[in-house]
């Protein structure tokens, strides 16, 4: 698969405190990569740096172009981003929030087209959330908001999709639909997905690749279709505590131990 995204020696933090220490990795077209780590290890800071929301040293390249040198508007056209926590968007319907995903591609006086509205409706439907379209976004549950914001991140079919704990508030059926759509979007459009999670089984079940992060450094990188059991188990044990791995449906699964 062709390399689509490359992070080069990223150092980033906040208020003068470095949190991410020279992290490098690349993502290929169609790849869904999970970033696994404990609270406070730097996952969110790394994802924000990838999106140009937190600046530091190094660089992030998408299709050979520096994301950090692009305008904010151009980055927003290339990246679909879902933050860890939703913010209040008063007096907007769920459909209006999803339609905001088109704004970076429109001129200041343009409005989304009828075709784009249909795309927004279809994306909500693919997430099982079409019934939320007319609802007041501010009155939705956290899980419902997460689905709407995920639809906003995906509706424009961006080349790079960055998701901070997209599974944290979703029930199991919603989680399955969301991951199915992410995989279909990545493969159909040649995009790549980088998502962070605390749930080792979630990562093992759905990702093509697993990155592990500890104290601001990447400490593991496994292609899950070819990873050997014992090195993967040892890496997960170091990160999560004692675990055993089984193969279920052709994929690894954690049998024991708590997630980070």
Positions of the model-derived regions?
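Helix-to-loop junction immediately C-terminal to a conserved catalytic motif
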Residues: 51
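Catalytic Walker B motif of ABC-type/P-loop ATPase nucleotide-binding domains
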Residues: 161-165
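The feature captures the beta-strand-to-loop junction immediately N-terminal to the Walker
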Residues: 36-38
């Amino acid at each position: 698969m062709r390399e689509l995204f490359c992070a080069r020696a990223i150092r980033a933090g906040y208020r003068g405190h470095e949190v991410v220490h020279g992290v490098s990795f690349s993502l290929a077209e169609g790849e869904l990569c999970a970033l696994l780590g404990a609270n406070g290890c730097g996952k969110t800071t790394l994802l924000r740096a990838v999106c140009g929301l937190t600046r530091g040293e190094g660089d992030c390249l998408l299709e050979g172009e520096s994301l950090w040198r692009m305008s904010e508007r151009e980055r927003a056209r290339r990246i679909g981003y879902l933050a860890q926590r939703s913010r209040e968007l008063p007096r907007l319907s769920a459909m209006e929030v999803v339609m905001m995903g088109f704004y970076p591609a429109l001129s200041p006086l343009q409005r989304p087209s009828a075709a784009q509205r249909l795309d927004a409706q279809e994306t909500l439907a693919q997430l099982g959330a079409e019934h939320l379209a007319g609802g007041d976004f501010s009155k939705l549950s956290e899980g419902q908001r997460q689905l709407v914001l995920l639809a906003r991140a995906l509706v424009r079919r961006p080349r790079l999709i960055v998701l901070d704990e997209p599974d944290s508030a979703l029930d199991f059926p919603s989680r399955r639909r969301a991951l199915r759509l992410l995989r279909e979007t990545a493969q159909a459009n040649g995009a790549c997905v980088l998502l962070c999670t605390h749930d080792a089984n979630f990562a093992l079940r759905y990702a093509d690749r697993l990155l592990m992060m500890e104290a601001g450094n990447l400490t593991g990188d496994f292609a899950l279709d070819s990873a050997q059991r014992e090195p993967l188990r040892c890496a997960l044990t170091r990160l999560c505590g004692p675990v055993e791995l089984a193969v279920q449906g052709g994929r690894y699964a954690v049998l024991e131990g708590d997630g980070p």
